[in-house]
Each structure stands twice: as structure tokens, then as C-alpha cells.
Amino acid sequence: SSVNARPCSSPLVCPAKGEKFFGVGSASRIRQLPPRLAWCSIDWDQLCLLHLLGSGGFGSVYKATYHGATVAVKQVKKCSKNHLASRQSFWAELNVACLDHNNVVHIVAASTCTPTSQDSLGTIIMEYAGNCTLHHVIYGIGYLTGNNDGLKRDHEFLSTAQAVVYSCDIVAGLMFLHSQLIVHLDLKPANIF
């Protein structure tokens, strides 16, 4: 099995001020993704949030479907107390969007434009890495498994052989990120799938 780490990266790459986002809106109010992320946009009609997977200081992550595929959707909330930090968190996560490695979660799409019903700084659609985190496995805590009938609890425990596999996969992912001059700033068992 392969371990994926949720992306949280540095150094920060932020677009220049005064540029238009996907050719719409006024230049002073809408930010544009960097040129290397120009493919990023979300077809909102194809996105269906299923249920909350978790939330943290800068946003919430949902299990969802996008164009029929199961994905994880991170909505970065507008943080009134620390707006700069929430913006930096959003842009830092997008730094890994162009990277391709088995142990790094892939970004499917992203946008700073959100439907008016959402109070969000931005949305990132990522590959769905599963229901069970390393935290669940280490501590034998039940994890949520989705099925058509709803949610149920299940658990498994970490063996020595599994610990070695997880460790090797984590090191491989980190070595790749470091080779790209990216540092994971939130590495913990709850962010390892």
C-alpha cells in the first residue's frame, strides 16, 4: 500500500497583484493563479460534497465527487483574525499541484473563485486518499467508511511490517518534496493516508 501526505508546502509562490483571474473581473479584486497553475479551475456544476472528513485552523476537508470520481475537497476559510496566514496556506498548498509522486496527494483542480453561498478564500480538489489515516491505524481508532447505507465504524492495528512500509513511503515522499525545495509544514499521523 502507498502512503500519501496531504500537501502543505513552502516556499510560498503567490501571484502578482493586479492580474486577472481566468480573464474575468476587475484586476484589483481578483487574484490569478501562477502561470504554472493556469489549468486550475473548478466546474462547480460537477462538484458534489458528500460529507465532512475533518477541519482545522485554515479550513475543512470534505469527501466529494467531481466529474463522477471520488475526491477530497479542501475549502480554505476566510480567517478574519489572520487573513494573510490563511491566504499563504492556500497558495502554499498549490505549490505541489504540478508535482507527480506516488507518495504525494495529487491536485485535481483549484480556484479562488467560489459560489456566493460559500464563505471561502479558495477551494482545492485533491485525489481522495481514503478514510483511514496513520493516526487511526497507530491508535486503533475507528475510522469512517462510506457506503450506500451511510457510515460505519471499523478499525485495524499497526504491525511492525506495516510500520516499516509506512516509514519508507513517508521518507520517499519527503525526499521527493525536499528535492523540489518544498518543506511539508504539517506532517503528522492524521495527515498521512
Swiss-Prot record:
Taxonomy, superkingdom: Eukaryota
GO molecular function annotation: ATP binding; protein serine kinase activity; protein serine/threonine kinase activity
Coiled coil ranges: none
UniProt: ATP binding residues: L53, G54, S55, G56, G57, F58, G59, S60, V61, K74
InterPro entries assigned: Kinase-like_dom_sf, Prot_kinase_dom, Protein_kinase_ATP_BS, Ser/Thr_Kinases-Pseudokinases
Annotated ranges, domain Protein kinase: 47-193
Active-site residues, as the UniProt record annotates them: D186 (proton acceptor)
Pfam families: Pkinase (PF00069)
Catalysis: reaction(s): L-seryl-[protein] + ATP = O-phospho-L-seryl-[protein] + ADP + H(+); L-threonyl-[protein] + ATP = O-phospho-L-threonyl-[protein] + ADP + H(+)
Keywords: ATP-binding, Kinase, Nucleotide-binding, Serine/threonine-protein kinase, Transferase
EC number(s) stated in the UniProt entry for this protein: 2.7.11.1
Family: Belongs to the protein kinase superfamily. Ser/Thr protein kinase family.
Protein name (Swiss-Prot/TrEMBL): Serine/threonine-protein kinase mos
Record organism: Sibon nebulatus
Species lineage: Eukaryota, Metazoa, Chordata, Craniata, Vertebrata
